């Protein structure tokens, strides 16, 4: 992933603010609707008074005590309310106190958040000469709005929020098309004037389930570090829910409850190839938001009307969002949220402890797309079309008790006992159609039917089916560290985290693993398209890197935890995407031809969901080999032969691409030409280690798949011969060079390191670079073994590269150090990854990984890394506790999945395994490694069995579904037998003197048919 400047972070990561809009002509549905023009008065009294709100910081123009116009939260003061006297092209600002706004030549000095302001706006008793005019703001990063221009000023003449956005900013001038220029005009009676009511957080809350993210203030009021620095409340605090394809982010506002939603296939762009950032490429779009504005009258900005005992949470055990608080009268309010995969909708449920207390106005707003909602009969909807796909969203409000009315502005419910809101959304995208669309005319009815079907059910029924569905996946794998308890709000847990060994630190690490699996389930089900750089969640227009499908590490990392943490089904949208693009659609074959290859397929670094690519690093054609390894790994974990038969043609055609493309070097090996080690060093060189290791894995996997499929592989004898020849003569990308001290003393001079480039020294690279592209051989592959010179060289390369990294890079380093069998170093990287992000790597308070900005791949990389510390099987050898950190003295990891479709559960205490259970789901031969394996009693289906152990490795066999227990502490009791009873012992089976059933190979004192005997 490319670097991003802090300025660009600030540009793309701001919170999207909904603005009242009117329709405008659009091109491809991408241009935002024009903002609504405020009312102008010609003279005299009266007219409409507005807050003039800057979208960048959600603050309004206010008269300050130092005789300036500054930006503060609206509080209803008369000096904050402005009318516009004149016309759009020439008007004056006048507040309710009769003051005007003028451009001053009395400058303001520099502050910690901004440079000196030479021409600040100030209040005056006189009008501004020449007046002001309004023009539509071209910048829409934070929403659609206006720019204010001083008519008498030349050069930089657009009113501008001065300095970094915060509280108390002065107002100066800048050039047009800056996000700090954009304002909207809001009627004070339709705006609280503050981000939320007065909120008092709970002091006593404890979550029902330990695996819960929880907070004592809404995302709407929570403070951002250093005044924001471009990060948004969405990125820092909003909580994600998702059904795998359709999802939402929850803010927990009491005054205005926003549910911001996304759909995985809501992409602008086309299948074409375009320049980087070009229009044809498109981007992942923000679908929109629904708002529930409180009309109860129970809450306000003062302490006597505060919402007290406030808590909002995301329960990972049930995939449920929740907000809870009380009124001054003691009424308890609860709001619950789910994204139901069975129902394919998002559902919000509002209740109160006393009847008749729920009153809201519900509205919808489109996000980064153009659409105006319409309302009728308790429902709201909007729709539109982008360059390729069409979209539709619909909500339905279902109150119990009270009254409901619908007008052109929204849906109002007064005095209800309970309210359920059902939200549906989708597009006409189809991964298998040549146009990438299908059933466009039926889309609106499809969404309407989906919403109606859910609305017919009760909340209890919808919730029950949602939880049952979700837990069938989430409940398979359980990671627990002894002594942990979740009694600290998650933001405080992060702030207090120091990577120590205390219960709070271990709780955060345990929670982070569970969150990774939660995000995998929530972002990767349904449509055959992979999760993107932000999973399925995005709330802004100018999202970083278009929130696209990056093929040089990022999308692959999204799926690293899928197989080992027993979420194999979540891998399928990515695998089916690869298969469809490689075999069914033409684009990836076109990109292969663009690179001079008549056979096979490939894609480049940046990809959209239509097979389209940007022009960035189009020589990164090795992506096809990396993608194909995912096709094979899924087979290794599931042993699904029919699946392998289906996807094998994609593996074979990727191999054909490289069989034809490889060049024979002067040393007699085959090299990948014109390659690149992402994103690092020489931009074009033959024999780069990254590409060589990938092609080695591709060829090895393809040959292994041919062995499995036999004649069903349908490989010609010619191709098979070429494949074997190229594989035998392939440069494996596993050369070493001696370190010369060029980058300092991280490793001794003379140490061997892995070569990143065959023909260039390591000195062509960058010290501490975030990509470890030449270490594919260690992770995610297993091409080098512990105890070898190459293994040691890889470890030296990691030490030399250092621990500093971006968020996703730390995810990779965690896995690399786990494969290096150094659990404490792997946990050290985890410690770094869990530090709060203040402009760089770490996590946000909602545990989103920070590159920066938010990138979800780091969440998945860390989840996989924790799994690798506990169990590894990629080499075919099941390693038990291969890299257990010393801080994790006691705990368990139940329900992991090993290669060969083996379910593995491990318990440990004092850093040593106490029990290991292996369920052999398909009767495979299992090779298991553990340092003290010879000390374990081995039970196969409750039968004590002698097993040969050599070099801490045992080979175990069994029938389909057989369970092997490795008992290290003597605590295991075979099911159904505690001791030998005389009448039960006459069954022909063999027991030891402890009453445990043993097999026929057992030697020693035994009991058979009720008689003791010595078996030699």
Task: Locate the predicted segments by residue.
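C-terminal catalytic domain of Rieske-type non-heme iron oxygenases
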Residues: 534-535, 539-540, 552, 670-676, ...
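Lectin-like carbohydrate-binding module/patch detector with strong preference for beta-trefoil
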Residues: 25-197
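Catalytic cores of secreted or luminal carbohydrate-active enzymes
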Residues: 286-302, 856-899, 903-904
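Aromatic-residue-lined binding/catalytic grooves and analogous aromatic/hydrophobic interfacial grooves
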Residues: 197-615, 635, 652-655, 665-670, ...
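Short, glycine-anchored, charge-dense loop/turn motifs used at functional sites
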Residues: 516, 993-996
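Terminal processing/anchoring signals of secreted or surface-associated proteins
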Residues: 1, 159, 975-980, 995, ...
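C-terminal tail/sorting-segment detector
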Residues: 1005-1016
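Residue-level detector of functionally pivotal "anchor" positions at catalytic/ligand-binding pockets or at interdomain
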Residues: 193-196, 971-994
């Amino acid at each position: 992933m490319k670097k991003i400047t802090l300025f660009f972070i600030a540009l793309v990561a701001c919170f999207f603010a909904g603005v009242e809009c009117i329709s405008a002509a659009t091109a491809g549905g991408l241009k935002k609707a024009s903002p609504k023009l405020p009312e102008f008065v010609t003279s005299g009294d009266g007219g409409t008074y507005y807050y003039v709100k800057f979208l960048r910081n959600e603050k309004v123009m206010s008269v300050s005590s130092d005789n300036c116009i500054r930006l503060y939260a609206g509080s209803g003061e008369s000096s904050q309310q402005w009318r516009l006297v004149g016309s759009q092209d020439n008007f004056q600002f006048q507040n309710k106190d009769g003051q005007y706004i003028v451009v001053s030549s009395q400058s303001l000095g520099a502050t910690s958040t901004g440079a000196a302001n030479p021409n600040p706006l100030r209040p005056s008793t006189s009008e501004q000469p020449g007046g002001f005019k309004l023009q539509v703001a071209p910048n829409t990063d934070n929403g659609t709005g206006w720019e204010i221009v001083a008519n008498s000023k030349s050069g930089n003449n657009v009113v501008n929020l001065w300095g970094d956005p915060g509280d108390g900013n002065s107002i100066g001038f800048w050039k047009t098309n800056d996000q700090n220029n954009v304002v909207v005009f809001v009627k004070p009676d339709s705006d609280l004037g503050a981000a939320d009511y007065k909120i008092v957080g709970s002091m006593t809350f404890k979550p029902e389930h330990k695996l819960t993210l929880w907070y004592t203030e809404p995302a709407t009021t929570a403070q951002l570090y250093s005044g924001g620095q471009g990060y948004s409340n969405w990125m820092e605090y909003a909580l994600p829910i998702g059904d795998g394809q359709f999802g939402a982010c929850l803010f927990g506002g009491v005054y205005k409850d926003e549910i911001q939603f996304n759909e995985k296939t809501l992409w602008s762009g086309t299948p074409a190839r375009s320049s980087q950032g070009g229009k044809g490429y498109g981007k992942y779009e923000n679908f929109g938001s629904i708002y529930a504005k409180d009309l109860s009258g129970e809450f306000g900005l003062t302490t006597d009307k505060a919402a007290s005992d406030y808590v909002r949470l995301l329960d990972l055990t049930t995939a449920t969002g929740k907000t809870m608080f009380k009124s001054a009268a003691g009424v308890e309010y609860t709001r619950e949220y789910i994204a139901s995969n069975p129902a394919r909708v998002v559902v919000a449920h509002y209740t109160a402890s006393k009847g008749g207390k729920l009153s809201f106005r519900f509205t919808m707003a489109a996000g980064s797309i153009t659409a105006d909602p319409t309302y009728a009969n308790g429902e709201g909807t909007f729709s539109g079309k982008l360059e390729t796909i069409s979209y539709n969203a619909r909500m339905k409000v279902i109150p119990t008790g009270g009254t409901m009315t619908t007008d052109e502005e929204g849906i109002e419910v007064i005095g209800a006992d309970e309210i359920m809101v059902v939200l549906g959304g989708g597009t006409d995208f189809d991964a298998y159609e040549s146009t990438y669309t299908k059933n466009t005319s039926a889309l609106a009815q499809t969404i309407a039917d989906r919403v109606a079907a859910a609305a017919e059910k009760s909340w209890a029924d919808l919730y029950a089916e949602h939880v049952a569905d979700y837990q069938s996946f989430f409940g398979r794998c359980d990671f627990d560290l002894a002594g942990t308890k979740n009694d600290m709000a998650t933001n405080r847990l992060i702030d207090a985290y120091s990577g120590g060994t205390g219960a709070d630190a271990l709780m955060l690490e345990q929670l982070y693993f569970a969150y990774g699996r939660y995000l995998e389930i929530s972002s990767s089900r349904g449509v055959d398209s992979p999760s993107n750089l932000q999973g399925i969640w995005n709330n802004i227009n100018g999202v970083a890197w278009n929130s696209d499908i990056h093929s040089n590490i990022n999308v692959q990392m999204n799926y690293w935890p899928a197989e080992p943490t027993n979420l194999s089904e979540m891998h399928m949208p990515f695998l089916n995407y690869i298969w469809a693009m490689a075999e069914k659609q033409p684009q990836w074959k076109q990109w292969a031809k663009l690179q001079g290859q008549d056979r096979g397929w490939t894609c480049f670094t940046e990809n959209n969901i239509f097979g389209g690519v940007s022009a960035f690093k189009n020589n990164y054609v090795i992506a096809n080999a990396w993608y194909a390894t995912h096709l094979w790994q899924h087979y290794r974990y599931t042993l699904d032969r029919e699946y392998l038969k289906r996807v094998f043609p994609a593996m074979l055609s990727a191999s054909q691409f490289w069989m034809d493309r490889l060049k024979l070097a002067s040393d007699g090996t085959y090299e990948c030409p014109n390659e690149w080690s992402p994103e690092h060093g020489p931009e074009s060189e033959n024999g780069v280690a990254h590409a060589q290791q990938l092609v080695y894995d591709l060829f090895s996997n393809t040959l292994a798949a041919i062995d499995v499929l036999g004649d069903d592989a349908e490989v010609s004898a010619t191709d098979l011969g070429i494949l074997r020849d190229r594989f035998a003569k392939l440069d494996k990308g596993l050369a070493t060079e001696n370190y010369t001290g060029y980058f300092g003393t991280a490793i001794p001079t003379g140490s061997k390191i892995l070569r990143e480039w065959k023909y260039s020294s390591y000195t062509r690279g960058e010290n501490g670079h975030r990509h470890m592209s030449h270490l594919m051989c260690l992770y995610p592959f297993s091409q080098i073994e512990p105890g070898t010179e190459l293994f040691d060289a890889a470890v030296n390369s990691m030490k030399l590269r250092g621990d500093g990294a971006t968020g996703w890079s730390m995810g990779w380093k965690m896995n690399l150090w786990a494969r290096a069998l150094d659990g404490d170093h792997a946990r050290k990287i985890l410690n770094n990854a869990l530090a709060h992000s203040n402009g760089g790597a770490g996590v946000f308070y909602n545990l989103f990984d920070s590159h920066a900005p938010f990138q979800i791949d780091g969440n998945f990389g860390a989840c996989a890394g924790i799994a690798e510390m506990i169990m590894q099987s990629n080499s075919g050898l099941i390693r038990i506790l291969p890299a257990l950190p010393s801080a994790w003295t006691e705990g368990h990891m139940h329900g992991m999945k090993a290669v060969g479709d083996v379910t593995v559960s491990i318990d440990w205490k004092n850093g040593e395994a106490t029990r290991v259970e292996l369920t052999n789901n398909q009767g495979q031969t299992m090779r298991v490694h553990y340092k003290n394996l010879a000390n374990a009693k081995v039970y196969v289906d409750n039968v004590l069995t002698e097993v040969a152990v050599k070099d801490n490795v045992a080979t175990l066999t069994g029938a389909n579904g057989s369970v092997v227990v490795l008992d290290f502490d003597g605590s295991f009791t075979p099911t159904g037998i505690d001791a030998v009873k005389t009448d039960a012992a006459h069954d022909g089976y063999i027991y030891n003197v402890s009453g445990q059933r043993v097999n026929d190979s057992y030697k020693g004192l035994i009991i058979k048919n009720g008689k003791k005997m010595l078996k030699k």
